[in-house]
């Protein structure tokens, strides 16, 4: 009869669930107020005109309009604004 000695246990084999971060509405897309534009950790993108920032740094539309991405300021920060149509 074949015998195999018991293998040891392992401390690997688990991983966290993906958080589905990233841009949800791209430049030029029409959005309604309340639409999530970006889910992010920290402020990779900053809130511009008609855009709010949630407590987890999620950016969302405060008004209906088109999404506009812009880079401005001395630090070349990325801002997201909503331009009314």
Curated annotation (Swiss-Prot):
Domain of life: Bacteria
GO annotations of cellular component type: cytosolic large ribosomal subunit
Record GO terms (molecular function): structural constituent of ribosome
SUPFAM superfamilies, per the entry: Ribosomal L27 protein-like (SSF110324)
Keywords tagged on the record: Ribonucleoprotein, Ribosomal protein
Spans annotated as Disordered: 1-20
Key word Glycoprotein present: no
Record-level GO BP terms: translation
InterPro entries: Ribosomal_bL27 (IPR001684), Ribosomal_bL27_CS (IPR018261)
UniProt record similarity statement: Belongs to the bacterial ribosomal protein bL27 family.
NCBIfam families, sorted: L27
Protein known as: Large ribosomal subunit protein bL27
